[in-house]
Amino acid sequence: MPKESGRKVVATNRKARHDYHVLDTYEAGIALMGTEVKSLREGHASMVDGFCTFYNDELWMEGIHIPEYNQGSWTNHSARRRRKLLLHREELTKISHKIRESGFTIVPLQLYFLDGKAKVEIGVARGKKEYDKRQTLREQQDKREALRVMRERNRG
């Protein structure tokens, strides 16, 4: 079987970009069990409540739901277990220094396969205020309206 090439997105945390200003992004590997990889290859994952924390100078991802593999037996994993993220030591220290500042957090943005290996894109982010969210929605609506007007003008 030939190796996969390219990026196959499994899950995206759309809520993260709505609730946070993402400042920096990093690509990290994930330490997974075999049944988790099989479940991800089927496209099953939810990142809605995901977040990352430091334990013993290691970065862990929590709140990600990867359902049990259908054909798995007693070797199946628990769906919401904590998963270790694999990053270089320099990246870990850089991230830990950033989140020590008040108001910063680490959120998982996207879960994907890159050349056959499971990866997660994490972002160092700061929470948005309610008025920021409303302003973002207003800007998106204005862009949509402008595109609609341009389409109508080009048609006619």
From Swiss-Prot:
Entry-linked Gene3D superfamilies: 2.40.280.10
Principal cellular location given in the protein's record: cytoplasm
Domain of life: Bacteria
Disulfide bonds: none
Keywords on record: Cytoplasm, RNA-binding
Gene Ontology CC, one term: cytosol
UniProt keyword annotation of Lipoprotein present: no
Subcellular location: Cytoplasm
Family: Belongs to the SmpB family.
Protein name: SsrA-binding protein
Source organism of the structure: Arthrobacter sp. (strain FB24)
